[in-house]
């Protein structure tokens, strides 16, 4: 029984230390502005995809207009 208590206490201690280290690392990432960089990358990618989608949509509309009016 005593060895089981020691094992559980050791497991609890190691889990607490691990959690503490994760929180410190997360705090360091927030201080460095890591999230801002990720948001900026997402914004750039999103803008590029929107631009490409608009270009493709405009081209499809132009072709559809051409075929519907028989002015090709």
UniProtKB/Swiss-Prot annotation:
InterPro entries: Frog_antimicrobial_propeptide. One of its GO terms (biological process) is defense response to bacterium. It comes from the Eukaryota. Residues 1-22 form the signal peptide. Pfam families: FSAP_sig_propep (PF03032). Its main location: secreted. Residues 23-42 form a propeptide. It is found in: Secreted. Keywords: Amphibian defense peptide, Antibiotic, Antimicrobial, Cleavage on pair of basic residues, Disulfide bond, Secreted, Signal. Disulfide bonds join 66-72. Expressed by the skin glands. One of its GO terms (cellular component) is extracellular region. Belongs to the frog skin active peptide (FSAP) family. Brevinin subfamily. Antimicrobial peptide. Active against the Gram-positive bacteria S.aureus FDA209P (MIC=16.5 ug/ml) and B.subtilis ATCC 6633 (MIC>64 ug/ml), and the Gram-negative bacteria E.coli O111 (MIC=8.2 ug/ml) and E.coli ATCC 25922 (MIC=8.2 ug/ml). Not active against the fungus C.albicans. This is Brevinin-2GHb. The gene is br2GHb.
């Amino acid at each position: 029984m005593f060895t089981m208590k020691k094992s559980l206490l050791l497991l609890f201690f190691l889990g607490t230390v691990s959690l503490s280290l994760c929180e410190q690392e997360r705090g360091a990432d927030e201080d460095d502005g890591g999230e801002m960089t990720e948001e900026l990358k997402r914004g750039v990618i999103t803008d590029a995809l929107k631009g490409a989608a608009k270009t493709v949509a405009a081209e499809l509309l132009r072709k559809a207009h051409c075929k519907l009016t028989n002015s090709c």
